[in-house]
A protein has these predicted regions:
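Charged catalytic cores and adjacent phosphate/nucleic-acid-binding surfaces used
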Residues: 1-12, 16, 20-29, 53-58, ...
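Aromatic-lined carbohydrate-recognition surfaces of secreted/lumenal glycan-active proteins
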Residues: 117-129
């Protein structure tokens, strides 16, 4: 069995406003820790992955290579179901995924129509950010049947949140991913997902998930989260994020509408 170890939730300095570690440095830390690859999952942006592509092209021109696998993903901010991790087939380009604010049912439809997979990040975490703590889906979790996986372990979530996330994955018979959700260097590599077989690109990953090739996930809790540092004050930050997300969704309304028209017209 060819087992590969990935960190499946990674934020970079280039792609996430709150990311502190450039992607080349991020990948280097994971490689030194014995990881085979990572999923770039910046907030509503592929800028981090594009920075990696640029680095990779420079290596090729210099006649060098790197066997560490960097997969293109995104953490999408829905308007009604919190954060959703999305992976599209290799070479796929959907501008709509960089425009926050779609309702989750429409996001699921778009991703599946284009051959991708998706699942809720930290599903039992913070209010508004996590699907089981949203007003619309708190008591209506049948939508879980439509996902392809669940993030079962997130290093930035507490033990109870991760326990419930794994129970959710088990109840709906979904494979569970593990990811550090790292924004800072000291959080990188605190979670993992083990895959059965060679995963060299996004299409490999999608095929692996669909054939039941997710073996295990787990990790350790990161003690330096904003929630840990701020305590009760963190609730104010969560409320401000809700406002920011809705404002961002309104700001991108016309761009989303234009991209949706293009998507369904084609």
């Amino acid at each position: 069995m060819n087992e590969m170890k990935f960190d499946m939730h990674c934020h970079t300095k280039e792609g996430s406003m709150d990311g502190k570690v450039p992607i080349v440095q991020f990948a280097g830390i994971l490689k030194r820790k014995g990881y085979d690859g990572m999923l770039v999952s910046d907030h509503n942006s592929y800028k981090g992955y594009r920075a990696w592509e640029k680095h990779h092209r420079m290596l090729e021109r210099a006649g060098e290579s790197d066997d560490f696998v960097v997969l293109k993903g995104i953490e999408y901010d829905t308007i009604d179901a919190g954060h959703i991790l999305v992976i599209m087939p290799t070479g796929s380009k959907l501008k709509i995924l960089e425009l926050r604010g779609l309702p989750v049912q429409l996001l699921i439809e778009i991703v599946h129509e284009n051959g991708g997979i998706l699942g809720p990040a930290h599903p039992c975490g913070e209010k508004y950010l996590s699907i089981t703590n949203t007003a619309k889906y708190r008591n209506c979790l049948s939508v879980m049947d439509k996902f392809d996986f669940v993030e079962g372990f997130n290093a930035c979530e507490d033990m109870d949140s991760n326990r419930r996330a794994k129970e959710l994955a088990k109840h709906f018979r979904k494979p569970a991913f593990g990811g550090s959700d790292a924004h800072k260097a000291d959080c990188i590599g605190l979670a993992y997902t083990a895959f059965d077989g060679a995963v060299r690109n996004e299409s490999d990953l999608i095929a692996c998930v669909r054939r039941g090739g997710v073996l295990d996930c787990g990790g350790v809790h990161y003690e330096g989260t904003t929630k840990d540092r701020l305590g009760k004050v963190n609730k104010l930050l969560v409320e401000s994020f809700r406002f920011y997300n809705r404002l961002g969704s309104m700001w991108r309304h016309h761009s989303r509408k234009r991209e949706l028209h293009r998507q369904f017209k084609s």
